[in-house]
Amino acid sequence: MADRNEQILTPSQLNSLARDLLEGGFPLVWVEAELSSVTRPASGHLYFTLKDARAQIRCAMFKPKSTWLKFQPREGLRVLARGRLTLYEARGDYQLVLDHMEEAGEGALRRAFDELRARLTAEGLFDAERKQALPAHVRRLAVITSPSGAAVRDVLSVLARRFPLLEVDLLPSLVQGDSAAAQITSLLQRADASGRYDVILITRGGGSLEDLWAFNDERLARAIAAAQTPVVSAVGHETDFSLSDFVADVRAPTPSVAAELLVPDQRELVARVRRAQARMTQLQQHALGNAMQRADRLALRLRAQSPQARLQLLHRRQEDAGRQLRARMMHVLERLQARVQRGQAQLQSHNPQRHLAGLQQRLRALHPQAAMQRRLQHDQLQLRRIARSLEAVSPLATVARGYAIVTRPANGSVVRSAAEVVTGERLRAQLADGSIEVRVESGES
């Protein structure tokens, strides 16, 4: 009979403990074996047995993972499977739950690929910070590939169609086999050292993991990472990945896409050039228009500030002053002309118009502003002296000082002497503010 102090387990508890031990004690494992008892129910899950000559293990691959298998699982097929050990508690079945499975021919290569990829990742060879940007305009391109493969035909066809001016050097190489990796590495290093190329393209068409294995070589990966020239990798189809893709500066899913990435479409380029030319013409016209407007404004300012312009302005002012002065003088002369013949003769002899003409002629001969200003001041002083002289001889000025001009009303003749009048004669005396009629009472000479 069992010791009451010992723990008594139920089947569920025991299976749960066993499951925990299996899942905790075994990490992710790889198993290479032969498929047997393959079934796929309506759920889409895949159930089978992996076996060798002496043992077997039940396996399950659930629908989200089995959908992505690249082959059709069948009886007797040798595979490489990856999964975790577990226990199906309801029946106590020990089994392997898989998340990846491939045909066994690629199994060893896949493990080597994963190990090398993890090591190079840890070294930072795949870091985005170390990758170089492609130049905006590629002028010389080196293409490392098989000269007889479909990849080179696709690349050259796209390049010729999109940008025929590109200079392309084909560096022929093996792209699969034992010596392919060394040959590709050597060509890459020589092309990079030459400094001739803007970009180096490494490419080939699709194939199995074994066919593409040259592009998973560690020496090639390190050569790509060390290259000073930007490197583009386009190996296989879109779903294929190689170490050269991860370490290259740019990865293209196919050779054709790589060619499209490297060069612009010449039709698009021509359109861009035309748009740029139109924009440049527009900017030039705008700049020219602005420059002409600025030039016109400067020319106007220069003309306005030039000595000649200043002289013309002063000349116009002088002419205006002369016209005003002449108008005033003519008004006075017109009133006195009929009455004072001699005064009119004196006024005509001192007519300011002749003096103004002389002054204007001298002003036009003066260009520098300072000299013109001095001459203008001198002429203004002279005009004032002439005006004072005219006022001194003007009959009106004499009358304004308290004198009178005496004339005969009958004929307007001026009485110049007391001897010319007789007692009782009626005369007219012209005063400053009007005239009066007078009669001679007596006279003395």
From Swiss-Prot:
KW Coiled coil (keyword) present: no
Encoding gene (name): xseA
Subunit organization: Heterooligomer composed of large and small subunits.
UniProt-recorded name of the protein: Exodeoxyribonuclease 7 large subunit
GO molecular function: exodeoxyribonuclease VII activity; nucleic acid binding
Entry keyword set: Cytoplasm, Exonuclease, Hydrolase, Nuclease
Keyword Nuclease: yes
EC numbers on record: 3.1.11.6
InterPro entries reported for this sequence: Exonuc_VII_L, Exonuc_VII_lsu_C, OB-fold_nuc-bd_dom
Protein family according to the UniProt entry: Belongs to the XseA family.
Catalytic activity: Exonucleolytic cleavage in either 5'- to 3'- or 3'- to 5'-direction to yield nucleoside 5'-phosphates
CDD domains xrefs: ExoVII_LU_OBF (cd04489)
Signal peptide: none
GO biological process: DNA catabolic process
Purpose: Bidirectionally degrades single-stranded DNA into large acid-insoluble oligonucleotides, which are then degraded further into small acid-soluble oligonucleotides.
Species whose genome carries this gene: Xanthomonas axonopodis pv. citri (strain 306)
Subcellular location: Cytoplasm
GO CC list: cytoplasm; exodeoxyribonuclease VII complex
First-listed, main subcellular location of the protein, grouped into a coarse class: cytoplasm
